[in-house]
């Protein structure tokens, strides 16, 4: 939808970091907020992070185990984007995943 740059807080990723397995996951907290759940407290590989700057209209695809995050938006520009998560039909999708909202879902009456 819009350019994602270092200045407006683009994603950063650890090349090859998905090969180390899932070390932590973002989950929905009991209070409705979000938190990290540590699955493996061993250190991440010593790999330099790279910015994933993307121009408007770019599709960015990440492996589910790839360590990634976005930095703060330090500019006067917005950083709107669509995020689509695909999960195989037979996959175990934890109920506490951060994308799961508290039930009952509101606004669909």
Where do the model's predicted regions map?
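Double-stranded beta-helix
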Residues: 4-66
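Non-heme Fe(II)/2-oxoglutarate
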Residues: 13, 26-27, 56-61, 65-109
């Amino acid at each position: 939808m819009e350019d994602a740059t270092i200045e407006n807080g683009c994603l950063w990723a650890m090349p090859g970091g998905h090969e180390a397995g899932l070390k932590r996951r973002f989950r929905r907290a009991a209070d409705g907020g979000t938190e990290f759940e540590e699955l493996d407290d061993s250190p991440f590989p010593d790999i330099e992070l790279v910015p994933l700057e993307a121009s408007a209209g770019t599709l960015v695809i990440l492996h589910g185990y790839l360590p990634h995050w976005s930095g703060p938006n330090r500019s006067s520009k917005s950083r709107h984007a669509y995020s689509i998560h695909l999960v195989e039909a037979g996959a175990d999708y934890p109920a506490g995943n951060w994308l799961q909202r508290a039930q009952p879902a509101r606004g669909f009456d």
